[in-house]
């Protein structure tokens, strides 16, 4: 038996634009129903199944609440898998990557918290813009190749955002 569709687990349609509050509400509701405390006196098989179901729900929730992971999952559902470390054949984006990394490195070297906050805001705006572009591409089956390119960009910005959070933590110490 294959893994259940992440969207179906939460009774949602497979689409990029997801109401994250509703997703969170459904997740909490479903995860309560398989909480280990509810199965403390149940046979071992039922306990194991509840634990597996909780793990499936958690995996689905983590995927759907993250825009880059949700976008990649949608591509996968449609039979279009990106290599884990897909090379970007986009010189403009490669240049942008180098510029962003250089800017982050300068912020790290200067320990500029205000600069990091500004960089983080700019990064969030860029992520929101890409998410909007992906949503538009996703709704048009003729633009799936463009959607793949945008997923790669989303993944890069998501990784960069993680690095910014780590830098903030180091500078706060």
From Swiss-Prot:
MF GO annotations: ATPase activator activity; protein-folding chaperone binding
One record GO biological process: protein complex oligomerization
Keywords, sorted A to Z: Chaperone
SUPFAM superfamilies per the UniProt record, alphabetical: Chaperone J-domain (SSF46565), HSC20 (HSCB), C-terminal oligomerisation domain (SSF47144)
InterPro entries named among the record's database cross-references: DnaJ_domain, HscB, HscB_C_sf, HscB_oligo_C, J_dom_sf
GO cellular component: iron-sulfur cluster transfer complex
Pfam family name, one: DnaJ
Domain J: 5-77
Family label: Belongs to the HscB family.
Subunit description: Interacts with HscA and stimulates its ATPase activity.
Described function: Co-chaperone involved in the maturation of iron-sulfur cluster-containing proteins. Seems to help targeting proteins to be folded toward HscA.
Designated name of the protein: Co-chaperone protein HscB homolog
Source organism of the structure: Pseudomonas paraeruginosa (strain DSM 24068 / PA7)
Biological classification of the source: Bacteria, Pseudomonadati, Pseudomonadota, Gammaproteobacteria, Pseudomonadales
């Amino acid at each position: 038996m294959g893994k259940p569709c992440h969207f179906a687990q939460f009774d949602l349609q497979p689409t990029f634009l997801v109401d994250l509050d509703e997703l969170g509400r459904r997740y909490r509701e479903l995860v309560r129903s398989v909480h280990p405390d509810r199965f403390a006196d149940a046979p071992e098989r039922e306990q194991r199944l509840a634990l597996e179901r909780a793990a499936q729900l958690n995996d689905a929730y983590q995927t759907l609440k993250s825009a880059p992971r949700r976008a990649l999952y949608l591509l996968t559902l449609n039979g279009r898998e990106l290599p884990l470390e897909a090379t970007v054949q986009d010189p403009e984006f490669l240049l942008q990557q180098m510029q962003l990394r250089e800017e982050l490195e300068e912020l790290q070297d200067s320990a500029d918290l205000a600069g990091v906050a500004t960089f983080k805001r700019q990064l969030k705006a860029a992520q929101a813009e890409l998410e909007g572009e992906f949503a538009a591409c996703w709704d048009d089956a003729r633009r799936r190749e463009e959607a793949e390119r945008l997923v790669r960009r989303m993944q890069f910005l998501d990784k960069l955002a993680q690095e910014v959070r780590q830098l903030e933590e180091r500078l706060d110490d």
